[in-house]
Amino acid sequence: MTNPWRAAIGSLLLLEFSATFAATELEPSEPRFAFDAPTTLVENSLYRAQRQGRFFVVGLKKPHQVLSTSAVNGGQSTTVDYLVNHQSMEARGDHLRYMQQITLDRQQYHQTVADQLRIPSQAMALMGTAANIQNLAMVEKHFKGLSVRVFATAGVRSNAQRAGDPTEWYQHNDGVMVSNKPIATAQTKSSLTTDNQGTINILLLVNRELVPGAQTKIAVLASEAKAAVLAELMVSSKSSPFVATGTGTDQIIIASPIATESPPLPSASGHLKIGELVGSAVREALLDALNWQNRIQPSSAANLFYVLGRFGLTEERLLEGLQLHLSTVDFGLAEQNLNSIIFDSRTNAAAYAYSELLDRLQFGNLSPTAALEILLDQAAQVSVAVSAKPLRWPEFWKALADTNASEQANEPVDLFIEAVAQGWQAKWDD
């Protein structure tokens, strides 16, 4: 997991940073932290944004109102001077740091990071992640004198979920997390193989003073933009057959200056320019961050396993189904040229339509009594797409209907595979 209250650096790393970084005195107007060779990404009259190694820190030069999910100093504050995004471990196979994580509570982790940076823990808002800080995305949007800047890291490989998905964990009054599944059936993972690429961290800075409600509205807009990005990329939930809206450990920090000469903005509505800037900046930053961290980009979604994986389509299942429906010769050809099927744009278009129909049926937008006919119609289009022979749609539909009578209809994914096999066979039967 990459959530901040479990993320930690142990004593070995603390010694490493203590030896590497020299202490510096703090000056309120000139933020300092223990970087010996930082890269300054942005510096202006309001803040300095710097990165070194596994740390990204925004040091505020003037008082700011900060809204954050930080486990310590979280919520709304006017006493936070440092905004930190920290990589606490590698995304995969980091056994040592994974074990160190689960031994520290929220306060201990927060204090450890503050000590490494040589800054007061009470002046820091913190986000933790397993994403590579070097893959940090940065986007700024302007309108007249208004500026919105977003820094983001993002990973969704293992932890993507849709709001309301079933969960395994609950917490006691003392905050200890406990599985709500019986021990015999609770999922277990080896920390040697656990994939922790699952946190979206957003750090958003506005150059204008905001009333508290407007700042909270920005958090809403940022969440909406995040969900929109995952929908654009068709990122699947790992807990349900639906498109994800985020991950289980997403975090955010929003900062805006206070006590400025201009009156605070009273609203950050999506109907206002500030709302547009927030939404577009978050969207672009997350698209960039997901590309660099997970190599997820729009073209990545043109892949049958990506499109229908949330419904159970895998390479193994596809090959088994093709072998069932094709002759030995035709199957051998399909197996050797599988990429020409799974990456074909026309076939993926038909698959997207098929997945959307499955969603509509699950959401109750379409009558369940018509499900078989609805899926048969689109499955025939899948055969058309694979074969590139649209005039044979009626023939494809009838063949699929004959083998999928209501009392013996295939599962939706198996019907899709049968349609692919039929299309592949027809492609070469001139």
Where are these regions (language model features)?
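Alpha/propeptide regions of enzymes that mature by internal proteolysis
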Residues: A23-D430
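N-terminal signal peptide c-region/cleavage motif recognized by signal peptidases
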Residues: F17-A19
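Hydrophobic alpha-helical segments of integral membrane proteins
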Residues: L12-L15
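Bacterial N-terminal signal peptides that target proteins for export
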Residues: M1-I9
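Short stretches within intrinsically disordered, low-complexity N-terminal or propeptide regions
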Residues: I9-G10, F21
